[in-house]
Amino acid sequence: MKYDVKAFELLSNEEIADGIFDMRVKNDELAPLAKCGQFTHVYVPSKTLRRPISVCDSENGVLRLVYQVKGEGTKIMSEMKKGEAVDILAPLGNGFNIEKGKRYCLIGGGIGVPPMLYTAKQTENPLVITGFRNKDLIILQDDFKNAGAELVLTTDDGSAGVHGFVTDVLKEKINEVDEVCACGPTPMLKAIAQVCKEFNKPCQISLEERM
């Protein structure tokens, strides 16, 4: 797998939900190498460790990185301005193995939702299930619809979409798909893996927790 450290030009860095930012960075050499399910390491000035951010999309030499402000490092990221050079190690990880002819169920929970957008664009008629704690944290719904996905929104508190968890919807619709790909918090992934085991469906998972 080829990856490298390069300076990306920051094109935009906008808040799209409460504490969630949409960063677009350009590098014609590395951006096209990204596969769905892969991630990046973003260098944050004054911080020793890079921040792992999943690839939300890659198109025309532009990487889209959607991230949540959780600490000082990502707060500094959120303050970066258009035109700055961003030091990024990319692309990293194995990504999802997508096979032609299969229908996939793509499940994202919280900040595990963004990598599912690029994955949806690489699949045919995917079923996408997104889960959020409440309506204030909902992101990327129009993007998934524009990608041609069958979309189901869930919220833990019922403030938008289906009241409940992504696994509730998965159990109802799992026989409509051939395989499941999921990204999100560990408890959610464990529950999804258990459902897939019960229904004898292949499952690929990607951890969204910070390394």
Placement of each model-derived feature along the sequence:
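Ferredoxin-reductase
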Residues: 2-84
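FNR/FR-type flavoprotein reductase catalytic core
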Residues: 72-210
